[in-house]
C-alpha cells in the first residue's frame, strides 16, 4: 500500500475530509507482535508519504494515530519509548488514547486473563491495577508521569483581577 502505487495517494487526495485516522496502536515491535500488527516502521513510512502528498497538493490534512496502553506484554518502559518516538521524534499531539479493554474472543483478552501467550506458553506481563494503568497512560501526555511534569513546570501567576467577596461571588 505504501509503495509507488497510486492507491494511497488517491485515498488521501479524494477520500480524506481533513483528518485521516490510523491505528498503529504501539511503537515497540515486541508489543506489536503480541497485537499481531506490523512493525511501527510501516506507520513511519505511511506518515512520510502522507506528508509528501499533503505538501505537494497543498492540503492541510492531519494524520491522527491511535494508540493503546496497558496491552498485555506492554511494560512502562515500552510506554516511555512510545512517548519518545511519537511525541518527541514525530511531534504528534495525541488525541486517540485508550487503555486496553478486553473483549471476548480476542487474542489480547486471552493474554489479559491468563497472563500468557497461548501460542508460545510464555508468561506475558499484564498491567492490572489502576495505578499501573494510570502510569502507562500518563506517557501519552507529555512523555512523563504527572508528578514529574509538576516538578518541571513553573507555577502560573495567579490572576488578581478578580477577588472573592464575602458572599462567594466574584467581583472586580
Map each language-model feature to its residues.
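Conserved SAM/AdoMet-binding glycine-rich loop
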Residues: 1-64, 68-72
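Short, acidic/polar
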Residues: 4-8, 76-84
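A structural signal for short secondary-structure junctions
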Residues: 14-15, 57-60, 89-90, 132-133, ...
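Eukaryotic scaffolding regions of large macromolecular assemblies
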Residues: 53-57, 82-83, 88, 111-116, ...
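C-terminal non-catalytic interaction/assembly regions of soluble proteins
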Residues: 71, 85, 101-103
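Intrinsically disordered, Lys/Arg-rich low-complexity segments
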Residues: 151-172
Amino acid at each position: 500500500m505504501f509503495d509507488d502505487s497510486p492507491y494511497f495517494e488517491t485515498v488521501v487526495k479524494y477520500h480524506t475530509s481533513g483528518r485521516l485516522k490510523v491505528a498503529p496502536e504501539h511503537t515497540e515491535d515486541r508489543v506489536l507482535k503480541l497485537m499481531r500488527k506490523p512493525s511501527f516502521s510501516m506507520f513511519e513510512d505511511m506518515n512520510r508519504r502522507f506528508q509528501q502528498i499533503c505538501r505537494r497538493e497543498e492540503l492541510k490534512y492531519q494524520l491522527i494515530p491511535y494508540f493503546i496502553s496497558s496491552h498485555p506484554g506492554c511494560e512502562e518502559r515500552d510506554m516511555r519509548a512510545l512517548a519518545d518516538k511519537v511525541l518527541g521524534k514525530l511531534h504528534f499531539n495525541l488525541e486517540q488514547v485508550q487503555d486496553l479493554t478486553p473483549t471476548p474472543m480476542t487474542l489480547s483478552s486471552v493474554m489479559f486473563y491468563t497472563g500468557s501467550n497461548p501460542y508460545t506458553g510464555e508468561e506475558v506481563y499484564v498491567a492490572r491495577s489502576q495505578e499501573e494503568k494510570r502510569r502507562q497512560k500518563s506517557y501519552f501526555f507529555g512523555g512523563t508521569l504527572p508528578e514529574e511534569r509538576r516538578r518541571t513546570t513553573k507555577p502560573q501567576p495567579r490572576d488578581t483581577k478578580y477577588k472573592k467577596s464575602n458572599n462567594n461571588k466574584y467581583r472586580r
